[in-house]
UniProtKB/Swiss-Prot annotation:
N6-carboxylysine PTM sites in chain numbering: K223
Binding-site positions, Ni(2+) 2: K223, H252, H278
Quaternary structure note: Heterotrimer of UreA (gamma), UreB (beta) and UreC (alpha) subunits. Three heterotrimers associate to form the active enzyme.
Cellular location(s): Cytoplasm
Family per record: Belongs to the metallo-dependent hydrolases superfamily. Urease alpha subunit family.
Protein name: Urease subunit alpha
GO process terms (BP): urea catabolic process
Cofactor note: Binds 2 nickel ions per subunit.
PROSITE patterns reported for this sequence: UREASE_1, UREASE_2, UREASE_3
Modified how: Carboxylation allows a single lysine to coordinate two nickel ions.
Top-rank taxon: Bacteria
One Pfam entry name: Urease_alpha
CDD domains hit by this protein: Urease_alpha
Amino acid sequence: MFKISRKNYSDLYGITTGDSVRLGDTNLWVKVEKDLTTYGEESVFGGGKTLREGMGMNSTMKLDDKLGNAEVMDLVITNALIVDYTGIYKADIGIKNGKIAAIGKSGNPHLTDNVDMIVGISTEISAGEGKIYTAGGLDTHVHWLEPEIVPVALDGGITTVIAGGTGMNDGTKATTVSPGKFWVKSALQAADGLSINAGFLAKGQGMEDPIFEQIAAGACGLKIHEDWGATGNAIDLALTVADKTDVAVAIHTDTLNEAGFVEHTIAAMKGRTIHAYHTEGAGGGHAPDILETVKYAHILPASTNPTIPYTVNTIAEHLDMLMVCHHLNPKVPEDVAFADSRIRSQTIAAEDLLHDMGAISIMSSDTLAMGRIGEVATRTWQMAHKMKAQFGSLKGDSEFSDNNRVKRYISKYTINPAIAHGVDSYIGSLEVGKLADIVAWEPKFFGAKPYYVVKMGVIARCVAGDPNASIPTCEPVIMRDQFGTYGRLLTNTSVSFVSKIGLENGIKEEYKLEKELLPVKNCRSVNKKSMKWNSATPNLEVDPQTFDAAVDFNDLENWLEQSASELAKKLKKTSSGKYILDAEPLTEAPLAQRYFLF
């Protein structure tokens, strides 16, 4: 039997079971859990390689032919290292008709056993050796202010947005709301010309009939925002309509505690599922204790990325952002006090730890209204690095294997936001049957700059060189638009998410939309337990005087490799015996100045 060293094998075919690779310049490593390709039968494209006629490529089968369960693919990504909530493993990925059709072994079934997907004359190849593949990310907190957010999102690995807004109007600068049929229609019509999946949230304040009218117009969910009034009555009515129409509800709660405190908001929910934006509170919400919502099973807590991770610059940055985003006047003392009440270093420090415990389930941006859409993935991995550096390995992880922590963090901007908004049957993970929205990364650039972004099987953005060069790798090598963003391909490789009732009402024809419309579903049946790798509900309390966030000893167990007793010795205790979640701000971040000039 022929033998080959692991080094030579990885150079030829990419790493395999038991090998590890570092993610960017972070301290995180992933270890390959399994390899679904076949040693000695690897699919490789190129001169002298295996995917040629009569070898790994079958030249007799037509596009619709099958052999067993295997069929001819439109595109095969060979020897991909998949990083997903489902696992960290190596496989070929087969794409057909815009969807992931197979994950496993590609090749020619006339010559090779156990082929899951066929490379035929109709098949294109993308060489995945040495690259990491993740599902396209979701950003569920997007202010629909300007179309240029789309290429920025794609360049950060985000292929889907749950947004709200009307363009550069003041209401949209503050709130993610497309109010009423005209603006829902306008948002969907604009999205029809943009290379990204999108769904839009309507205004959640009002009586049942006008709220229902917006969902019937195609809104995929509702947004309750304090700038429009986050009262108990608004919460109750929005959730009542949502339950009848199976759409999600997102909430930005009452910072000023005018209509009640956090416990009154919780009571108004009546145990019904709701997606809580920026749970820490710097982005808005009951001051100072909105963070306590992480302990409830019906609340799906999220963060926005300006506070992630907690660094030496975080506090100073926030005051000016707040004044602009919420139409506040720095000359009015009450407006300044409003802004000051939202910036608390204690709860910001605790936010990172709660993410690491799996108590905050979702990451998002709050783009152009404090957050940055192109940094959702980057800041998620910076936070994971910070937590490992300050607290050590997650339970079950080991040297050169941070797989559990990586699965926890990748879930925060892929599968969990998809579940929260009823689109997880279409997107959010690399699983057979889902849309082929896939992001490729060179390991050294992981989390910072993708190599390419595939939308429904077609490359939309890719690292590419000078268009007038003799080869595609000549400088300047930058992310550029590809054919997936042009012509009918644009509308054929993205979708819009709408309410089921809107779709049944014929809005596609009424609005003259070209993109496929997909209905959101199962929004009302999910809860915190539905969140992959992020379903913890610690008994958190925030001290109203000191703003310290503290949990019980039991909440520290089964989190880290170090024991809860060892960790407890390092944490300060409250007078009631709880343990304060605290960490030093980061002074130097990975995936930062080594990769970006600005």
